[in-house]
Each structure stands twice: as C-alpha cells, then as structure tokens.
Amino acid sequence: MYPIIKKEKLADKIYLMDVKAERVAKSAKPGQFVIVKIDEEGERIPLTICDYDEKAGTVTIVFQTVGASTERMAYLEEGDTFQDFVGPLGCPSDLIEEDIEELKKKKIVFIAGGVGTAPVYPQVKWLHEHGVDCDVIMGSKTKDLLILVEEMRKVATNLYVTTDDGTYGFHGMGTNQLQELWDKGVRYDHCVAIGPMIMMKFVCKLTKELGIPTVVSMNPIMVDGTGMCGACRLMVGGEVKFACVDGPEFDGHQVDFDQAMKRQLQYKTEEGRAMLKLQEGDTHHGGCGQCGGCLLYTSPSPR
C-alpha cells in the first residue's frame, strides 16, 4: 500500500497529493508518469509526476476531477492509501538527456495550460537546479484555476501568467502571449508545450510558423503503461506510437492532434458512463472496451 502523506486543494476540482513511494521517488525523472489504482474496484489512472523527493521517499501528483476514477481520488484524505502506485513509466524529458553546456546556449520556453502546469514544473525545476535558464508561459481560463504560480516563479527565469478572461496577468491565451513576445523581438530555440490537446495543437501551429522546434507531452487515456493494451496509441509522423512507452513526449509538429482528440473524446464519453455506474453503486470491469486492447484490424471478407 502507498499512503497519502499530504493532500492540498490547489483550485476548484484540482488536487495535489504527496504519496509515500520510495522506489518510485528514487528512480523518477522529469517527464515521467505513474499509474495509480485506489483499490481492487478502481480504474488505473495515469498521472504525470509533478515532483519527487528521494530523501523523503515521496512522489507528488496533481490531478483534476474529470470522471468517476478521479472523483473517487478526490475523496481520499491524508493517511488513506493507494493499492497500486506503478512507476516511473515513460521516457524522461529529452532536455535532461542533453549536454548541460549545450542547453545553456539555448533559449527555452515552456507553455503550460491548466493542469499541464504540474508536469512542466519538475522540468523547469530540474533545469534551474542545473543552471539552465528558461521562460515559462502558464495560463488558465480564469485566476481561480491557476496552480503552482509561486512555485513556478521561484524556478523560471521569466514567468508570464495568462488568463483567458483577463482576471490575472496577460489577458489572452498562451499562444497570444508567445506571439506578443515574438513581436517584441524575443526569440526561442526550443519550446515545450503541455496542456489540453486543443491548446497543444494551436501552440504547435504557431511555433511551426515561427520555426521553433516544439515538444509536447501527450496525455490520452493510458491503461497498462506498457503498450500492450493499445489504448494510448497515436499517429506521429505517419507512424503509430504509444504514449506510455514511446512518450509521453513527442515532436509536436509531427503529432496528428485531430486523430488524438477524436480518440480522447471517445474515452471521455465512456468515463462519463463509468461515473453513472459509480453513482448507482455499480462497478464494471473487463470486456468493456475502455482500454482498446481488444481492437482488431481485419481484412474484408472475400465475396
């Protein structure tokens, strides 16, 4: 069992938890994720690692309640436990694999949307600790949904906060802020965008026009974390990739976002059905088609 050491509500329906998971904390690197499961009846929930403390043996996760499984997580309190806390999974951020001196020569910008701020934070923190400067553009729909602003301010070289409704910081979206900086003569050599699919799509559209290489962290539904079920497959550069083993980071200019968003919408619908089952006291496992593992490609039958 993996006990919850700390729980904090960051914003409406957004929570932070520190979980005691010594092995995961010892091996974790920025960009990786874990898959958690509350109990035997719980679904497997993929969550990017927000932070980790090797000495304390804790891993920090941030999640938003968007369906049945995350709604159950929100009811957990300090002292409660997860049955499974599997990780670290996925490949670490490409940036931490690069030569530090070469990184210092680059002008790097992170663009975080909503809960996407959580997986951006450990990367920016790691770069800061290694003497690498980077700017961060982080935003949300409104001021009350902003998270980790002060934490990010401590590690970012320049922090630009945006809100869609203008209640805090720059009035507009992250792409608007990037365009304004570009118009003022600010140039970037590398961009990392993490957030909702639609946000990453339009960031990549802009950065492609501006000629800025861009990495995105894909977060479609992941189930087994090994690539066996096929739930997290996407098209990248015309090839099938699996977010849980090949990613979660990919070249944003090569990702087929339209196909990825179509798949994500399908799972949101099924998650909604799962919410109804939970509220009615019913659980449903196996043979439901949620993971995509039973999908087959067949040739037309001969006539």
For every predicted segment, state its role.
Residues M1-D80:
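Ferredoxin-reductase
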Residues V36, D84-F85, L234:
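A generic structural signal for residues embedded in beta-strands
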Residues D39, G87-P88, G237:
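Short, surface-exposed secondary-structure boundary micro-motifs
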Residues G42-I49, L89-E97, C244:
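Short, Lys/Arg- and Gly-enriched loop/turn segments at beta-strand edges
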Residues E71-V223:
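FNR/FR-type flavoprotein reductase catalytic core
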Residues P220-P248, G286-G293:
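Local cysteine-cluster metal-coordination motifs and their immediate loop/turn environment
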Residues V245, F250-L296:
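Short Fe-S-cluster ligation motifs
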Residues Y297-P302:
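Conserved small/polar residues in nucleotide/adenosyl-binding loops
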